[in-house]
Amino acid sequence: MTIHRRIEHPFERALSVSMEEIEIALRGMRKAPWAEFTLNPRRLRGSDFLMRWSQGVWSEDRLTDAVNSAGKYFAMPYGPSGTAPDNDVRAFELYFERLEKAGLGNIKRPDLLVFRVADKARVDSTVNQLNGPSELPFTAEEDGRMQELLAHAVVAVECENSLWRAKQMPNYTTPLTPQKRLGGRLGLKKGAVLPTIIIKEEDRDPLRTWERHRKIPIHIWHAFFDEAYGISLSDAEKLISSGDIEPTKQVFQAPGGATTEKVIYKIYYTHGYLLATTTEEPKLIADSITDRNGHILPYVRFVGGKSRLSAEASAVLDSMR
């Protein structure tokens, strides 16, 4: 397999799929004509990007609902992946095309902002002045209205998700033990399979810069099918800097089929906090999309499901700002 290094379009970056997450691989096939799919301006391959889109929408919605249902805080989409249309993949693509044409495609912002319910009226008023959440990525953060919005944020969130049942992963309960490769520090064998909170190397510097400039703490929230976990960016950085968490190279496939090798950090869930627990599982519904040439592409869509914010996560939010 040839790995191409190139500048990614924001649409491709948002929907790139880790090869580890693709369950069905067609090996030995250079080209599968039936997998070609024309969306709007670009030609795509396979349905994995549709699964990624549906999975991303579902996981962010589930975490947002968990925060909102707890009653003390509320979450709102902020970065492009959250503010883009969530019910039409064509509209999703065109949203990122518009972002790219505006010269904003490579601007990194956290996916969600979390506020206190006590500030909801002021936050809603400010967002309405900015023409709604979908327009936030097109407005400079130096704008006075954006400054007003950010002044009320308790925490900013970068969202990740994985198609795994966390509790069924083989090393879910395996205790950390001294590891030779880590200089005697606690860890697990390299091949251990357990829930991890993932941060990409390419995101580290932009997120650190944003956190420093905006003076709002960033947390990474990672949703699995049955549980979700969180960790602060500052704690993640300490684990990476100390060598407790090693870099891992992983291949990602973009919707158009191109592959890119990226460095990521898989932080053991035990280093973070339990964010939420699934109380009602989503349904996996068969769906399809028809391209402009009449080609039908089937995929599985995530529908419904509920999660409850943990007491530990509530305490983390209470401790901020």
Where are these regions (language model features)?
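Non-catalytic C-terminal interaction segments of nucleic acid-processing enzymes
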Residues: M1-E36, E141-R145, M169-L194, R204-R321
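Residue-level preference for long, well-ordered alpha-helices that form the structural scaffold
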Residues: R52, A192, T196-I199
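Soluble or luminal CAZymes and related metallo-dependent hydrolases
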Residues: Q55-S59, I198-D203
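Conserved catalytic cores of phosphodiester-cleaving nucleases, focusing on short active-site segments
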Residues: V67, P110-P137, E142-V193
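A structural signal for short, well-ordered beta-strand segments and their strand-loop junctions
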Residues: A75-Y78, A156-E158, I218-A223
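Short, solvent-exposed loop/turn segments at secondary-structure junctions
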Residues: G82-A84, S162-W164, F225-A228
